[in-house]
């Protein structure tokens, strides 16, 4: 079965190189992974390899349900997209949350009319973002994409498409020593950290999942580009890939404000496992990645963040891991980067966020385009 998006990108006419778009299918996953890997290696040869299972889920698995995406391929003689051709480009838009659309794309370095093709795909991203905004009933949605600061090629494409560089993120790494399994300081009096409670099935107790979600939402409310992710959206992302959820790497910090033994949630930490991999400079061992760390605003100043971080470090040491990684806003309003440096983290790379606010538009399926829209 070969399918086209109902409102596909308007691709440039390239003499001698006719192109068309179609919906991704299973055979496209490995060629797209190769494109992503080559683009990544061009700027960061030490990066972890592309996770093929994760990409497969995004392109043709459960995660594809929240995305609109196409691959670009050569055409058949009749102008339709070739079903058996390896993609030369891929673009995906995820309806992440109310007012937030995540963008991911790649174009082969030798693709014909590459700049024109990039412009066409970004224009389609704006089209798709506008449809998401209409469906959500919001005034706009924010197209968002993160790139390596060294990726000048991608930065030029995004700037030409109207996106703006808005933030820099520090990716930090801390080595782990075996003795840190039981040598780190404990939490302050009145603070404790525990893993989320698990059922015999291995799944977490619902109350703890909701507590972690609430702590993260409340803690990030005053951060840059913060957006509300409902619990339904949060849990849906977990359900999409339950095998990837490292429930043993979820922690809740609790605080006893009045000293009466009434422990209440004060912060949450969600982490995941980073497999060992080879790089251009040798092997990187297995590590822990801190996906989300949040402290409720009412609990700041009690050492909650340090307690959560130490819990993750000690756990990594017990598992024989050699590092703990995280990402932080270079201009964090809570100066979190300073805390991480004081605890041994060092910056290993930087990325940038590029954004574009897109207004909603009428449905192209139900209403014809106006002359202005088609200009």
What are these regions, as identified by a protein language model?
Residues 37-137, 147, 261-287:
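Conserved donor-binding loop and adjoining core beta-sheet/short helix segment
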Residues 2, 146-181, 310-375:
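Active-site/acyl-donor-binding loops of N-acyltransferases
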Residues 223-224, 247, 261-269, 277-289, ...:
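Extended hydrophobic-aromatic, low-complexity segments
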Residues 182-288:
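Flexible, substrate/cofactor-facing loop regions flanked by secondary structure
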Residues 255, 269-273, 292-297, 304, ...:
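Active-site proximal loops enriched in glycine and acidic residues that flank catalytic Cys/His/Asp
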